[in-house]
Amino acid sequence: MSKIVVVGANHAGTACINTMLDNFGNENEIVVFDQNSNISFLGCGMALWIGEQIDGAEGLFYSDKEKLEAKGAKVYMNSPVLSIDYDNKVVTAEVEGKEHKESYEKLIFATGSTPILPPIEGVEIVKGNREFKATLENVQFVKLYQNAEEVINKLSDKSQHLDRIAVVGGGYIGVELAEAFERLGKEVVLVDIVDTVLNGYYDKDFTQMMAKNLEDHNIRLALGQTVKAIEGDGKVERLITDKESFDVDMVILAVGFRPNTALAGGKIELFRNGAFLVDKKQETSIPDVYAVGDCATVYDNARKDTSYIALASNAVRTGIVGAYNACGHELEGIGVQGSNGISIYGLHMVSTGLTLEKAKAAGYNATETGFNDLQKPEFMKHDNHEVAIKIVFDKDSREILGAQMVSHDIAISMGIHMFSLAIQEHVTIDKLALTDLFFLPHFNKPYNYITMAALTAEK
């Protein structure tokens, strides 16, 4: 029987642990360390909880210590790993306030990512084992269940008068939180250093649609601005950028995350952004040491190269692959496309692969084709929304490199999966033009937007 130690019980860790227990539990001893007090919190639902679009946080958990131990794992919660002796294969952790040593034969990192801490004048950021705290009251981070709970508790305390909120960061989390706070009746300003929201996921013509959507719902955009300082007498009163000053009562820092690889200790090869560099079996540069989820690299099929794409969907898949290989059952990952989506005030946006800007930066002779149309024939008078699609492809090989879609019709979310597979399998734009796509007025048009975008692609 092999002894496998897992460091971290986040999405990747939970997927990894469950895969090992469900398939190879009789063959292995599984020991888990996690520095948090809870397991499997769905951070993607945090904004829904804060914005009161769901009843509470209970449904945002899908596993816990008891469930994992019932399957046969030994789980240590509130137990940060302090160091690892890779030569002697020993993990040192803090368990119930005491030093605890655990030997291993295989080691799996599922340590996730940590919030990026921007240097901001007037507020000192204190980093602890589990959370980040700011010395100025009402400067908040968003990552853990505890972070969301703290924000909700503060907003529920009417005596604090937290009516004006600045969200720093215009990525997915920042945009979702801006919507959540506005739904609570708060005055919201969204600040980002770049001149658009959702930068990197969509090209600018698409991000402008989301920007207009936010402004139409009374969210003020302060784009292309760098936060310089947060001012206040003990608590937040003002946020200062290089262009403006905003009177606010709370600041949410959502500028992004970086891989949590502090335990590498200079022994494990890291990617350029600090992530564990892994192969397609999720193994690091040290034999028998694996890394899964946000702490590790992935193989990007669009770039045809190693990359870093932190998504829960990638975390689950890499967790499964890492589990098989750590248990001695060889399995290679097939790579990812970075498929993603967002829904704000009923405007749905999905994308996969590379944007045109990213494709050119990656060295492709890239161009795009697009099409705007109704989802269904014009005679379908109800629930018939406009759809915009963009397909990015390489002019030399004709291979599809990426796709973006936006609509108030949620049905587009399924279409992006086809493009994800197309990128993975190196499908050309010309083959897509003749792909068998069914037609029924309840769903689409005989010449639907996917077909038309491909047919009108540059030759």
UniProtKB/Swiss-Prot annotation:
UniProt name for this protein: NADH oxidase
GO cellular component: extracellular region
Active site (catalytic residues): H11, C44
Entry's Gene Ontology molecular function annotations: oxidoreductase activity
Keyword Nucleotidyltransferase: no
Further comment: Successfuly tested strategy of using drug inhibitors targeting fermentation pathways for their potential as adjuvants to antibiotics.
Free-text remark on how the cofactor is bound: Binds 1 FAD per subunit.
Binding site for NAD(+): I173, D192, Y201, G256, A310, G341
A Pfam match: Pyr_redox_2
Sequence positions bearing Cysteine sulfinic acid (-SO2H): C44
UniProt subcellular location: Secreted, Cell wall
Keywords: Cell wall, FAD, Flavoprotein, NAD, Oxidation, Oxidoreductase, Redox-active center, Secreted
Gene name tied to this protein: nox
Family: Belongs to the class-III pyridine nucleotide-disulfide oxidoreductase family.
Residues that, per the record, bind FAD: 10, 12, 34-35, 44, 81, 110, 113, 143, 172, 294, 311-313, 439
Knocked-out gene: effects: Reduces total NAD(H) levels by 22.1% and increases the NAD+/NADH ratio by 20.4%. Modest decrease in the ATP pool. Extended lag phase during growth in media. Increases susceptibility to erythromycin, but not to gentamicin, chloramphenicol, rifampicin, penicillin and vancomycin.
Cofactor(s), by name: FAD
Enzymatic class: oxidoreductase
Source species taxonomy: Bacteria, Bacillati, Bacillota, Bacilli, Lactobacillales
The protein's Enzyme Commission number: 1.6.3.4
Main location: secreted
Function: Catalyzes the four-electron reduction of molecular oxygen to water. Plays a role in redox balance maintenance. May be involved in mediating bacterial adhesion to host cells. May be considered a potential virulence factor.
